[in-house]
C-alpha cells in the first residue's frame, strides 16, 4: 500500500468517525428535545386532581380548572402529532405518547372535554381528531392524507 492509498484510507476513516459523531449528537439533541415535551405533559398532569386521573367523578368546583388542563393537554397532543409528522421525534417516543393519549382520553373527564371541544371547535385540533379517528393507532409521519381527508370532511 502506498502513501496515497494510506492517506485515502485514513481520510475515509476520519469521515466515518465524523459522521458517527454527528449522528450521536443528533440523537442526543433529539432526546433532550423529547424530554422537554414530556416535561410539559408532566406539568399539565400534576395540575389535574387524582380522582380525574383514575376515572372517578370530579367535584363541581374542580370542573372548570380540570377542563382547562385537559384543553392544554389536547393542545400538547396536537403539537406532539405535528412533531411526529415533521419527523422531529422518534417512532419509539411517538408510540409512547400515542399510547398515553389513548389511555388518558379513555378517562371520563378527558373524553368528555375532548368531545365538547371537537363539537364546539370542529376546525381546531385537526391532527388530534385524525389520530383519535384512527383509534390512536397510527404514525402521522407515514401518512398525512388522513389530515387532508378530515379537513375536507369537516368543511
Predicted feature residues:
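An amphipathic alpha-helical interaction surface
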Residues: 62-155
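Membrane-proximal alpha-helical anchors
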Residues: 1-67
Amino acid at each position: 500500500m502506498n502513501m496515497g492509498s494510506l492517506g485515502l484510507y485514513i481520510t475515509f476513516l476520519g469521515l466515518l468517525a465524523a459522521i458517527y459523531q454527528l449522528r450521536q449528537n443528533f440523537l442526543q439533541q433529539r432526546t433532550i428535545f423529547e424530554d422537554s415535551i414530556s416535561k410539559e405533559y408532566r406539568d399539565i398532569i400534576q395540575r389535574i386532581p387524582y380522582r380525574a386521573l383514575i376515572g372517578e367523578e370530579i367535584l363541581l368546583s374542580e370542573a372548570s380548572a380540570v377542563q382547562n388542563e385537559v384543553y392544554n393537554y389536547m393542545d400538547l397532543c396536537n403539537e406532539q402529532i405535528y412533531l411526529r409528522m415533521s419527523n422531529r421525534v422518534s417512532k419509539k417516543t411517538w408510540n409512547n405518547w400515542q399510547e398515553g393519549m389513548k389511555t388518558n382520553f379513555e378517562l371520563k373527564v378527558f373524553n368528555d372535554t375532548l368531545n365538547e371541544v371537537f363539537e364546539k371547535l370542529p376546525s381546531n385540533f385537526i391532527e388530534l381528531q385524525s389520530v383519535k379517528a384512527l383509534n390512536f393507532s397510527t404514525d402521522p409521519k407515514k401518512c398525512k392524507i388522513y389530515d387532508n381527508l378530515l379537513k375536507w370532511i369537516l368543511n
